[in-house]
Amino acid sequence: MNSASKKAILVLSFGTSYENTRKLTIEAIEHDIADAFPACPTYRAWTSKMIIAKLKKRDGLTIHTVKEALEQMLLDGITDVIVQPTHVINGIENDQMKADALSFRDRFSSIVFGNPLLTTEEDNQAIVRVVADEFRDMDPDTALVLMGHGTEHYANTVYAALD
């Protein structure tokens, strides 16, 4: 990176209209990323335009879309963008986010993408270990049901791989 370069991280989430959930999940992840990479400014964008509109109307809270966040990054002099989604799988929202971000590829020196949580078989195995460890002391007569909301996207196959 030359001296004129300025790198930043765009943390990308679907979004939530529940304030407590936002603080415990999305904001916690954003803070962890900011703490891990203090030399890189972090920006927020959400993919759910419905939730963005709801928060604007109900709470007066402005959350950027991917394109709005990238426009702001340009105004702030950012030259290199790292996009890190908080998505669980590579679904429809993730594909749309990439398309939106890549529409800016000629306006930044680089745009690179991190992966959603469950991208590789190794990711699947790691999450199974973490969940099993988290619930290892559960009463053996108690059933544990874990659900993903599912999608028509081919990435839905990850749920069968976890079974």
For each feature predicted by the language model, list its residue ranges:
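Active-site-proximal alpha-helix that buttresses catalytic centers in soluble enzyme cores
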Residues: 1-163
